[in-house]
Amino acid sequence: MASTVSNTSKLEKPVSLIWGCELNEQDKTFEFKVEDDEEKCEHQLALRTVCLGDKAKDEFNIVEIVTQEEGAEKSVPIATLKPSILPMATMVGIELTPPVTFRLKAGSGPLYISGQHVAMEEDYSWAEEEDEGEAEGEEEEEEEEDQESPPKAVKRPAATKKAGQAKKKKLDKEDESSEEDSPTKKGKGAGRGRKPAAKK
């Protein structure tokens, strides 16, 4: 299936097309590939369902994806269907980049694979924005170096010995006055007062 994408803007929405193929005794393989287009679009095929046709025999039908890795062929089964047990399977999370080959490994079909073909225009604007961002970052660093650093906060001097003693005397006097005002305690230890602090 061919897709058309207009180049009216750089940030165009992706074009999504319904895609499907049939595998049977005569056509056991199908290759999904896209033609090189002038606009350099990124293509993906998201599989949705694999189902058997109404004329399928009551036998196991196994469909697999065939890939070429380092010159060696590698196959991955994606569904095993049988009309009396499981005539249809829903595919979730299988997104493939073309070219992709589907093969009917076992069974005679007909077996139908459907999905969504998405074509997105490659967006190189992020590279331009990144270059601009780096240039702006360098300018900001230079401006920061030109500015003087703010003056450091001056610490308050520590309390002197005389100030500490005066504060201690004041607290002692408050303790003595609060003891005189408080009512007498009953029970164990009643009548025992607190010894006044020695005066220095």
Swiss-Prot record:
Database matches in InterPro entries: Nucleoplasmin, Nucleoplasmin_core_dom, Nucleoplasmin_core_dom_sf
Compartments where located: Nucleus
Catalytic temperature dependence: Thermostable.
Modification sites for Symmetric dimethylarginine: R192
Originating species: Xenopus laevis
MF-aspect GO terms: chromatin binding; histone binding; histone chaperone activity; importin-alpha family protein binding; nucleosome binding; RNA binding
Residue span of motif Bipartite nuclear localization signal: 155-170
PTM text: Activated by phosphorylation of multiple serine/threonine residues, along both core and tail domains. The level of phosphorylation gradually increases during egg maturation, reaching an average of 7-10 phosphates per monomer, so that at the time of fertilization the activity of the protein is maximum.
Region spans: Acidic tract A1: 35-39
Protein's recorded name: Nucleoplasmin
Biased composition regions of type Acidic residues, renumbered to the chain: 123-148
Keyword hit for Acyltransferase: no
Free-text function comment from the UniProt entry: Acts as a chaperone for histones, such as histone H2A-H2B, and thus regulates the assembly of nucleosome cores. Involved in chromatin remodeling, especially during fertilization and early embryonic development. May be involved in sperm chromatin decondensation during fertilization.
Keywords recorded for this protein, A-Z: Acetylation, Chaperone, Chromatin regulator, Developmental protein, Fertilization, Methylation, Nucleus, Phosphoprotein
Principal location listed in the UniProt entry: nucleus
Site feature Interaction between pentamers, where: D58, K82
Family: Belongs to the nucleoplasmin family.
GO cellular component terms, A-Z: cytoplasm; nucleolus; nucleoplasm
Region (Acidic tract A3): 174-176
Quaternary assembly: Homopentamer, when bound to H2A-H2B dimers only. Homodecamer of two stacked pentamers, when bound to H2A-H2B dimers and H3-H4 tetramers simultaneously. Interacts with the heterotetramer formed by wdr77 and prmt5.
Omega-N-methylarginine: residues bearing it: R192
Positions where N-acetylalanine occurs in the chain: A2
Modified-residue entries (Phosphoserine), positions: S3, S6, S149, S177, S178, S182
